[in-house]
Each structure stands twice: as structure tokens, then as C-alpha cells.
Amino acid sequence: MMKRNIVLCLLVAGVLITGCSKKEEVQEPVPVEEDVPKEEAEAPEFVHTYPLTGVGTNDSIDQRAVAVMVNNHTKARPQSGLTKADIVYEMLAEGEVTRLLAVYQSEKPEQVGPIRSARDYYIELAKGLDCIYVCHGNSPDAESMLKQGYIDHLNGLYYDGTLFKRSSERKAPHNSYISFENIEKGAMEKGYNLTGAPASFVFLNKEEIKRLEGDSVTKVSINYGFPAYNTQFEYDVQQGKYKRYSNGEQTKEATTSVPVLVDNVLIIETAHRVIDKVGRRDIDLQSGGKGYLLQKGKVKEVEWINKDGRIVPVSNGVDVGLIPGKTWVNIIPNQPGLTKNVTLNAAGN
């Protein structure tokens, strides 16, 4: 009887233990993998960058640059096409009269002009950017270069009334114009390549622009020796660009009155030498020298060098980057030079 009771107790205890164990068993949840989206690299805003402006684009950038000799005589103003130029070079021709070399690659103006005659140093600048060079007439030195095929070119002397058109509103030699359509037409007729972009300049990124150093300067005046050909630039804070003036008159498009606005103003000095009785010059674009670079309302002293035919601002031998946008380059005699012929004015002065 006692054995029976012991066995019964053991059976009851076993049942109780088994029951408790079943209650204590907790089934752990099976982890479910969540679909976490992978972070993708941010796509660039544009796929290309224009080599002469540093401006982004999704269009082709392979078009060849075109350099046009633009008349800057008082009787030739206001001009056509300057607002579309990527780069404009301004320097003396004869006497105290300046002339402009307008370079186009990212934009094509409907019409450019008035067109003026070639000079050898402008040809050198155009050659450095592998441009098709457009002029109407030439100096003896320039004529020699053109006839020898030094640069692909269109000369209005041979296309007056065909590719080049005369405006009835002005008198010669201040009335020769050419459309961009006719530039391309003439280039194709002569078998010139219309593709082949120039090498790119160095441009600053957004962070580098924020860290720009230099003295605050809102206005600059450049003296070429005669008031009618003196040039001024004024920084427009709201637009973040420079407005250009000739003897106090703002530079605008002839037909639309759209003002010329630029992002970089580079002023350099170099040796000038008068070579004939007419007052033509030899201008040294090889040796380098001193300069001022104006960007975003600030100015800094730089040096310039000729790098593969291009005028490039440097500091301690390193390229000084340009603000993406348009650039105007003023080249002045080094006698008396920057300190005498360039006036820098700070805000409020």
C-alpha cells in the first residue's frame, strides 16, 4: 500500500512538472528582414561643363570656338553680340583706341559687330583657343599671318556684301556685321572643322567661391589714355556680377539694350611698343607679368602667364580659378602700369 502511494505521488509530481514546463516555454518571434533602401550617390546636376565659362550643361560642348574682332570706336557703339561672348579681350590698336576680341563657344549670337580689322596679337590670342578668327581687314603683320594659313579665318575684305553685311545706319568702317549662321556657312565652305572644343580653364567650385579672399572693391576704372576709351566695371551685389561701362556709359546690346554682365575681370599689364607712323603696336603676350583679378566684389593681386597660348592668372605659379561665367580681360601697357592706370574704389567711395 505504501509503495502504491509513493508511485502515485511520483506520477502526480511528474504531471505537475511537465505542465509547468509547457507554460514556461515561450516561442521566440522569427526576425523579419526589412527592405532598407540603399543610399544612392547623388547624380550630377549637369553632365558637361563648358570649357571657357565653367557653366554646366546637358548639351554638347564639342563646338569649336569662334573669335570675332569687334570695333570699339565711339561711332561703333553700341555693339551687337557682346552679351553672348564667353571671353572678351580688350586692348589698344592704334593711338588710344581700343579694340575687342569676342570669343564664342557656349552661346551663338544672332549677329556680331561692327567687325574691324585684324592685328597680329589678337590673332595670337585666338590661336591659343584654337578659334576660327573673324575680321574685316588687317594690318601688314596680320595679313602675312592670315595669308600663310596661321589660323583658320574669315576676312570681310573677301566677303563684303556676301557673308558680311553693311548696316545703312552707320558709315564705314563702323558698319560691317556678320551673322553666326554666315560664320558657320563660311567656315564650312572653306573646309574648316566646326567641332573641337578648346582646353578648359580652371574654375572654382561653390565652397571655394565662399572662401574667396581679397580686398573689397566695388568699382574699377581702367585708363587707356583717352576718356572715350577708358573702361569701368561696377560690381552689382544683387546679381553677383560686374556691369561694364565705356567712359561712364553702360555697355549694352544695340538691339535689345540687354547689359553686358561678367563674372571675372582680369586686368594685366605688359610691354607695348609703337612700331610705325600710324601708331600700330607690338604687344608682348608671352612674358607674363602683374595683374588684378576681380571676383564677387573683391580684388586680389595676381600674376599672369601665357600657358599654351592662353592668358592665365596664377598665384605662386598655381592657376587662380575663375568664377563660372563670363570673363573680360583688359590688357594695358606696363608703362606706367597698373598702379597708375587702374583705380580701385571700395564700397562707399
Where are these regions (language model features)?
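Positively charged n-region of N-terminal signal peptides that target proteins for export
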Residues: 1-6
